Amino acid sequence: VVNLPSLSPEVERDLSARMAEVERFLFDHAAGDFPFATETSRHLISAGGKRFRPMLTLLASNYGDPTRETIIKAAVVVELTHLATLYHDDVMDEAPLRRGVESANKRWGNSVAILTGDYLFAKSSLLLADLGPDAVRHQAMTFERLVVGQIMETEGPHGNDDRLAHYIKVVTEKTGSLFGLCARYGGYLSGAKPEIVDLLVRFSEELGIAFQLADDVIDVESSSNQSGKTPGTDLREGVPTLVTLLVEQMARPEDEKLLTLLSGPILDEGDVTFALAALRNHEALGEAKRITMQYAEGARKMLAGLPLNGTTEGLLALCDALVSRSS
């Protein structure tokens, strides 16, 4: 779970206790009648993770009544939804590693990984049914955006489309949308004022974009498995990222070999090593960090409309923790 050192002691104690409750609920709810399904679905749960999304739900609930029993369920719903998409993403990307452990598709094959993702969506839906029709509607709208974002990424930009703008749109739909749902659930299920909920949703979508852009930087810059994935994973898969798209925009004569490698998946490990070294020394990496901080700062500014209290300070700390991952 992400550490927020600047939280007030009171907010930190409360958040830690409720996050522990989410963790127990998440692990228990993944269980089913078929032991193998329980094993595969708990694979990534047990691997850990930052738990940004349920944490965001819990923090948002502090603007209303955070003791309502639906809040913990909502936090588990968003994390189960996120986990399900990871199983599916790893199949599409043929990723061997997730959260520092062997991916489900690598261990059990694509069919089991896909079905495990479906299973987690089903388990999420069971909880969602207890949250009311509005919660179901917003989950469906968010899921539509997630899928459309994935389709957009798979299809790629058309003709003269701005490749960077297309990518930011993909990130908004795939990552920003679920962050927004987290805040919406925490806000409106706790009975927060509608204007507060709206502000929290907009803040969280912007935060979600910054979160993914930070991951793009980490994929290039980390020398270890900082992101839980093998460094250079996106390069191996030929997936465009903020850093590689900026290299295209800021290309220099000496980048000819790098640009050739970035035009598709990089299969040779020697070429991956070369590309990572070239990207780490390219001015595009610094620009990617600047853009990431710009989105995080945009999210921070939205918090000016919220009451200045321990929870708002916690959301500010979340922004700082996110940016520090890529700085």
Residue ranges of model-derived segments:
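All-alpha prenyltransferase/terpene-synthase fold signal
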Residues: V1-S327
